[in-house]
Amino acid sequence: MTASPGCSTAKLAGLGATKDVIDEYLGTVSLSRLPGHDGVSKRWGNGRAEILDIEVLGPGEKPTSKVHTGDRVTFRFRYRVLDPDGLERPCLGFGLHRLDGVLISGVNAREQKVVPETLRGEGVYDYTVEKLPLLTGTYDLSAALQDEWCQVTHDWWFDGFRFEVLPAVVYESEGVLSLFGTWEQNGQTVAGADSTR
């Protein structure tokens, strides 16, 4: 195999199915942008606590990796505090990324005043979305357990859970999310959110 002009320093980054190689590359690129991260590990923190599990609960509160646009969805985060003194005013946050690394939403419990004085032992944080606006695609959830001001990281789990959003009856075919809007023409509703899931 001969190198093409301008590619004499090319390096083979991976072998396998195209999707898998691209996923691995995009994950490495995204991680390398985070401050204090080595660009390889998917978890880091001071070890005072750990996120045990990330789940998506679909209709019926059942764990799943496949949901539909418009479904009621709960993002569940199980944690364990390892420090015997507990964590003072901790904050859980999570990021929802598209497969190419684009951040769709960053949610932080502090913004909704869900910050306990002290956190000990094991427990669960649930974040429920009544009508999931995401359109068809593959998404990753990352989670972090930090101090109240997000200056100290106890555990950060990057891309801890991947899930698929499957098609539903919505009228947007482009972009990342459904607006669940309705069209009116001359004062009459002609199509829209009423006919979605």
Q: Which residues make up each language-model segment?
A:
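Localized sequence-composition bias
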Residues: M1-R197
